[in-house]
Structures are given as C-alpha cells and as structure tokens.
Amino acid sequence: MCIRDRVYHTYLLIPSSGYRTQVCAGWLSLLVNAGEGIDVDIFFDRQPKDKVQQKLGQQLRINRSKIKDTSDTNSDYDDLDSAIRSGYFLKDGLANNEDFYYMNILITVTADSLEELEWRTNEMKKLLLSQDMEAVTCHFREEQAMLSALPLVSLERKLFARSKRNVLTTSVASCYPFTSFEMCDDNGILLGVNKHNNSLIIVDIFNSRVYKLSLIHI
C-alpha cells in the first residue's frame, strides 16, 4: 500500500497459532526495538469471567471425552492433550482471581521504496521466526489493517478473529514493553529521576522513530 508522499506501508498480523506457549518478562522488547519503520499496535480485550469459565468447562469435558476414544499413536492425541493441559492452566488461573483477555498484535512496516519495504517485511518475519513466532501479511485486508492501526482503539472484526490469543493477567503483565534501565533522549522532556540509579528520565515523546509502540488497548 502506497500512501501520500510515496511512503509504502504493509501490515503484519501474528495469528492465533503464531505465539510461543511460554514467554519471559519483557518479551515484546523484540518488537519495540525492531528499528526504524516498524510500529507495533497491541490490543487487550478483557472477557467476562463467568462466561469464560462456563465455556472453558464445556470445552474441557468435550476434549476429555475425545481423548478417551483416541489412540496415543494418533496424530490428534498430542493436540488434544495439549488443549486439555492449556485448559486446566486457564482454569487454575481464573480460580486464582486472574482475568481472561484476548490479545492481538498488529505490526506496521513502512519504507520509502517498495524494495526496502519488502526487505523490512522479510526481515521482520525472520526475526519472529527465530523466536518461534509467526507473522502473516494482511493480504486483501490492507485497508482494514490501516484503519485498525489508527488511534481509534478498534481492531477490525475479522482481523481480531484471526489473531486473538487468550492470555491471563500475569501474561498481560509480561507484555510491558519498556524494559530499558535508562531512558535519556537528547531533545526530550525531563519527567523525573530513576529511583534505582538516580539517572534522569528525559523522553522525547514526539520522536516516533524511537518509540515504536503506538497503542495499547485494554
């Protein structure tokens, strides 16, 4: 997609199956610090706990019934076993007063030329693949992705369905993107003092080339 002033855009979506099962704190720093031309939009949509618990219980009973009739040498056995273990993990988390969210990640890639855009897109996919993650291009959904990337706090319905990933409160906390020990920009605004090392916190909030995270919706 080419938008005014010959700036080329493309949009990547992390599908529901494209996330790692386990992540460490600050894992989104990989995307936030990806470099120039990479912007990240993260959406969190909290779901009603009572409805989630009811639906989760039903799905667990269905999966337990299916696995009884499946041989342990069948290729479906591992998928069912993983689904059951994930279901109990979510059930235990909800019982411990955690909330249930759907998370979506939309990545905007921009460049001054089509060749550079293709290179950045491929490098971004390789970067995620090296971390056992996957990103897909929003083919034929570029307009919807562009509107979703605007600061309107609204992810298009089909993009949401394709990329939603269930997470609990602790998993949401691990998505906090700012993990740098120091933060000091040359032309920034003094916000305060870092209590851990007494360094000044000076941030240029208008420099979009440095701070790539444009939207967090909870």
Which ranges hold each PLM region?
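Extended, folded cores of ATP/NTP-driven motor/assembly subunits in large transport
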Residues: 4-178
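Conserved small/polar residues in nucleotide/adenosyl-binding loops
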Residues: 1-5, 216-218
